[in-house]
Design a protein with these regions (language model features):
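Small-residue-mediated transmembrane helix hinge/kink sites in multi-pass secondary transporters
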Residues: 20, 52-53, 141-142, 200, ...
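A gly/Pro-rich, aromatic-decorated transmembrane alpha-helix motif that marks the paired
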Residues: 128, 132-148, 197, 201, ...
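C-terminal module of multi-pass small-molecule transporters
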Residues: 58-68, 84-85, 101-105, 112-125, ...
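Transmembrane core module of solute transporters
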Residues: 1-43, 149, 187, 212-229, ...
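Intrinsic disorder in cytosolic terminal tails and internal cytosolic loops
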Residues: 178-181, 445-492
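Transmembrane-helix bundle of Major Facilitator Superfamily
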Residues: 1-170, 304-305, 313, 319-327, ...
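C-terminal membrane-cytosol helix-exit motif in multi-pass small-molecule transporters
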Residues: 158-177, 193-205, 222-237, 438-448
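Short, Lys/Arg-enriched, Gly/Pro-containing loop segments at transmembrane-helix junctions
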Residues: 177-182, 239-245, 369, 410-413, ...
Length: 492
């Protein structure tokens, strides 16, 4: 499961540094380059709920292997692509494969580890590997594009995919929902896709086409109508794709909301901090990617120790404290100016990474305990989808705030660099406020229902645990924002 997570996370941001090389090789237009990135994100986000429900109905291992096969073969096609059309199509199919396999990864972990300590350790490893993929993506992409043919950024997935498929076939048992809830809700599947596809499209393309463009307004309208239809269908269906009663759980709703706040903040800031490093401090793309390595390593380290902290302090305190560390890290960034050196950046990176790593495993465990195991796949898919959409919203909203402040500074006579820095700092302050609200949300919704102490979570019922989304990766698509670094013409 960790190998699969590494591969899909890596594919979200490994293309960033290689984009100029791909453009020269395939003679792509700017619009074509955008779709090399966007096609993957569009199909991934649009089909996550479908993948999660199919995993519950037809078997988590089966869907995982199907997704892995699709992802691996499409990686081969992308690596060998000789034209922009073939590459964009292959990237879209990669997103389909990722949408099938990702919801199944944590559902399989839940089914495979019945002991809470072992399960928490497995989730910590999963999160740490994802964080390492974040760090490795820009570095691997830069090295490959500099020394080898760009296609190898996709071809490296092929042996990993084959090995993962073989390991899964040999060592992973099949699991699925009980027969009573294994009927496929086809209208719900269609409505969910019709809601997520246009919403994702509008969030990706709105900045380029203009938020009032007919196609963007139409996409938002279609998403709203489809989402309303989805809720009506799910409320009236005997065997719904998504049991709306899941959201009556304080832990599930609060945990999902906390993850959305986390994703909104971390993915938006990841994107604009990349711009700050390159456009204000003069970092090269590869150097900017390397600058995030200490943060990703802190995510991995603190994800590994988070279970011990949670066992002593409880999930609500651990998650809230992790978000406090993230707030402090961003506050340090808000103090940086035009002449900041890397030693000035490092404390903020490390605190932010430590907080992100510390909060995600306990957050995942808390949400897992609020959901029936039979709904593991769809619970994972819901959190994946909410994380994807929240991350894109983070880029969109923080970007709008940045550009508004930047424009005001330019009108006041500031030079472009100072104007961008002013907008960046404003975006940081808004994100700090949002994460501070997340501290309260997580503490209040994840606290135990009884007054009993929570030093040992093994007393909790193990048979009703479920799963969650991509944990500790500021990826993210994991790393949807990192992918977007190359495609926002409105930022200087």
């Amino acid at each position: 499961m960790s190998l699969a997570a590494f591969m899909t996370y890596l594919d979200n941001n490994v293309t960033n540094v290689a984009i100029p090389t791909i453009q020269r090789s395939l003679h792509l237009s700017v619009a074509g380059l955008e779709w090399v990135v966007s096609s993957y994100l569009l199909t991934l986000a649009g089909l996550l709920l479908v993948g999660g429900r199919l995993a519950d109905v037809y078997g988590r291992r089966r869907l995982f292997q199907a997704g892995m096969a699709v992802f691996t073969l499409s990686s081969l096609a992308a690596g060998l692509a000789g034209s922009g059309g073939v590459l964009i199509t292959a990237r879209a199919v990669q997103g389909v494969g990722a949408a099938l396999l990702m919801p199944a990864t944590l559902a399989i972990i839940v089914a495979s580890f019945t002991n809470i300590r072992e399960r928490t350790m497995a989730i910590g490893i999963w999160a740490a590997v994802g964080a390492l993929a974040l760090a490795a993506g820009p570095v691997i992409g830069g090295l490959i594009s500099q020394h080898f043919r760009w296609g190898w950024i996709f071809l490296i997935n092929v042996p990993v995919g084959v090995i993962t498929f073989a390991i899964t076939a040999r060592y992973v048992d099949e699991s699925r929902a009980p027969d009573a809830i294994r009927r496929l809700d086809l209208p719900g599947l269609i409505a969910s896709a019709l809601a997520l596809f246009p919403l994702t499209y509008a969030l990706i393309e709105g900045e380029v086409d203009g938020w009032t463009a007919p196609q963007i307004l139409g996409a938002f309208a279609l998403a709203a109508v489809a989402a309303a239809a989805f809720l009506v269908i799910e409320a009236r269906t005997a065997n719904p794709m998504v049991d709306l009663a899941m959201f009556r759980s304080r832990e599930f709703s609060g945990g999902t909301g906390t993850m959305m706040i986390w994703s909104f903040g971390i993915l938006g800031i990841y994107f604009f901090t990349s711009l700050y490093l390159q456009q204000t401090l003069g970092f090269s793309p590869t150097k900017a990617g390397l600058a995030f390595v200490p943060m990703a390593l802190c995510v991995a380290l603190f994800a590994a120790i988070a279970p011990r902290v949670e066992a002593r302090a409880g999930a609500h305190r651990t998650v809230a404290f992790g978000m406090v560390l993230m707030v402090v890290g961003l506050a340090l960034f808000a103090r940086l100016g035009l002449q900041a050196g890397y030693t000035s950046l490092l404390p903020g990176f490390m605190l932010f990474g430590a907080g992100a790593g510390l909060m995600n495993v306990p957050l995942t465990n808390a949400v897992m305990q609020s959901t029936q195991a039979a709904r593991a796949g769809i619970a994972s898919a819901l959190l994946n989808a909410s994380r994807e959409v929240a991350g894109l919203l983070g880029i969109t909203v923080i970007g709008a705030i940045l550009r508004t402040r930047q424009s005001a500074a330019l009108r006041a006579g500031a030079d472009p660099v100072h104007a961008f820095l002013d907008g960046y700092h404003t975006g940081l302050l808004v994100t700090i406020a949002l994460l501070a609200a997340g501290v309260a949300v997580s503490y209040l919704t994840l606290r135990p229902r009884s007054a009993a102490p929570v030093p040992n979570r093994e007393s909790l019922a193990l048979g009703e645990l479920a799963t969650v989304d991509e944990l500790a990766v500021p990826s993210p698509a994991g790393l949807a924002p990192a992918a977007a670094v190359t495609r926002n013409p409105a930022v200087p």
